[in-house]
Amino acid sequence: CYLDPRQGAIGCFEEACRNVVCTGANPIGMVDHLQFGNPEDPEIFWTFMESLEGLTEYAKFLRIPCVGGKVSFYNETPLGPIKPTPLIGVLGIIDKTPFLPVPTNNGDYLIIIGKTRDELGGSEYFEYIHKFIGGICPSVDFKDSKINMLAVLSLIKNKLVKSVHDCSKGGFAIAVSE
């Protein structure tokens, strides 16, 4: 979120939606807790506003209301302000029963839904393995995001999958191992 606050906040929101979708639920509401440094610093205030506008834009697109939230400013240490930290919770409704994953077997297929791009900016991989902070941040294509979530919900509803996991922190390798 600190490299591109708008896309970072949207990415947090989308990940929360994907987590709900992976249970077979349709996202219907969102709550947020936005944590930032001193808003009297113009750069920090700009970061906050960009994050807020990104969340608003994605919520309007998905028609998901923000039903509650909290903003926490002045989060700083002697070394300076914290990185912008949007925390997003999404609520969903399940039509019948929750999707309960079952163990996979040899011979089962692994299906990847969505596109991958060369967007590792701001990742822990870059920061901790390569000691690099920067790069191109992941961005969310709103239409593709919605189409992908609807596809996953359809697969779950039609009992065509044994388990579903979103790809987020740790990337593909962590998603597969979990």
Predicted regions and their residues:
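Glycine/proline-enriched, intrinsically flexible loops and inter-domain linkers
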Residues: 1-178
